[in-house]
A protein has these predicted regions:
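Acidic, metal-coordinating helix/loop segments flanking the phosphotransfer/catalytic sites
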Residues: 19, 36-54, 62
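Two-component/phosphorelay signaling modules centered on CheY-like receiver
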Residues: 19-36
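A short, hydrophobic beta-strand element within the central beta-sheet of small alpha/beta folds
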Residues: 56, 60, 68-71, 75-89
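CheY-like receiver
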Residues: 110, 114, 120-161
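Acidic di-acidic motifs
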Residues: 14-18
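Phosphate-coordination loops involved in phosphoryl transfer and adenosine-cofactor binding
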Residues: 9
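Alpha4 helix (beta4-alpha4-beta5 surface) of REC/receiver domains from two-component response regulators
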Residues: 66, 85-117
């Protein structure tokens, strides 16, 4: 599958305190109207004022979970993206706070595929958690061992605002 160019008309905010990560996101999401922010305050302003199709939030460095709360208040679907917080605790917190997905930065080279998959699920009114578990479950199980089996996925995959 070659997903590039399938993001036409999508307005996406990407928030990360690492410029090189934002550059990779821009390359991966070619065709989208991409807005980037590298710190909390500018991201907050965009979330509170722009109509967005998706928000991609780093967890560390930019207060990603606080930004997730703001995005959810505006009924904006948000994906948590992280390198340093690839923990079962952060994963569960993302589910509990109603993010639509959680992506390790080690998957950045496949970000376009993953975001396309997320948009497909969103178009059906669903989160990406089930697809994510199918796609990256073995990776998370390798990282977290038995803890992976204890993750509490949403009972209803439909988006609830």
């Amino acid at each position: 599958m070659e997903p590039k160019g399938t993001f036409e008309g999508k307005k996406i905010l990407a928030v990360d305190d690492e410029r090189d990560v934002l550059e990779v996101i821009a390359e991966q999401l070619e065709g989208a109207h991409l807005i980037t922010a590298s710190e909390f305050e500018s991201a907050r302003q965009v979330i509170e004022s722009e109509p967005l199709d998706l928000v991609i939030l780093d967890i560390m460095g930019v207060k990603g979970f606080d930004l997730l709360d703001l995005a959810r208040a505006r009924q904006l679907p948000a994906v948590m993206l992280t390198a340093h917080s690839v923990t079962a605790r952060s994963f569960q917190r993302a589910i509990d706070k109603k993010a639509v997905s959680f992506l390790p930065k080690e998957e950045l080279s496949r970000l376009d595929e993953l975001i396309l998959e997320i948009f497909q699920e969103l178009s059906k009114g669903r989160t990406h958690w089930t697809k994510l578990a199918q796609r990256l479950g073995p990776t998370f199980k390798r990282l977290w061992g038995e803890t992976w089996e204890q993750i509490k996925f949403p009972q209803d995959p439909n988006i609830s605002w």
